[in-house]
């Protein structure tokens, strides 16, 4: 199955974001999954303040990861992200059913940065 995870990590240290993505990536690869794309969207204001782990956040560092994995692997990635105190919020979406004609509709992750506007 093709999945997409959008994660928001507490801002300030890019090494934390890299470590978190590396952990999730290793988990996917070790269980036979394939990582299709990873994008670093950078730090942005959150739509509203979010409180997690007794901290209030107004900004977050966004990243997107698109990958093929089994349902069990996807659930483990979700649990790992949810348990990590560096993560403010994640959103997970199932994009495809694993068939080639379905997967071919999804290209690169679209993003228009502020510099391009």
Swiss-Prot record:
Going by the entry's taxonomy, the superkingdom of the source organism is recorded as: Eukaryota
Pfam short name (any one): Ribosomal_S6
Give any single GO term for biological process: translation
**Which Gene3D superfamilies has this protein been placed in?**
3.30.70.60
Name a GO molecular-function annotation: small ribosomal subunit rRNA binding
Cysteine-cysteine disulfides: none
Q: Which InterPro entries match?
A: Ribosomal_bS6, Ribosomal_bS6_sf, Transl_elong_EF1B/ribsomal_bS6
Sorted alphabetically, the keyword list is: Mitochondrion, Ribonucleoprotein, Ribosomal protein
Cellular location(s): Mitochondrion
By sequence similarity, the record places it as follows: Belongs to the bacterial ribosomal protein bS6 family.
How does this chain assemble?
A: Component of the mitochondrial small ribosomal subunit (mt-SSU). Mature N.crassa 74S mitochondrial ribosomes consist of a small (37S) and a large (54S) subunit. The 37S small subunit contains a 16S ribosomal RNA (16S mt-rRNA) and 32 different proteins. The 54S large subunit contains a 23S rRNA (23S mt-rRNA) and 42 different proteins.
Sorted alphabetically, which NCBIfam families does this protein's record hold?
A: S6
Q: What does this protein do?
A: Component of the mitochondrial ribosome (mitoribosome), a dedicated translation machinery responsible for the synthesis of mitochondrial genome-encoded proteins, including at least some of the essential transmembrane subunits of the mitochondrial respiratory chain. The mitoribosomes are attached to the mitochondrial inner membrane and translation products are cotranslationally integrated into the membrane.
Instruction: Provide the protein name.
Output: Small ribosomal subunit protein bS6m
Q: Which organism is it from?
A: Neurospora crassa (strain ATCC 24698 / 74-OR23-1A / CBS 708.71 / DSM 1257 / FGSC 987)
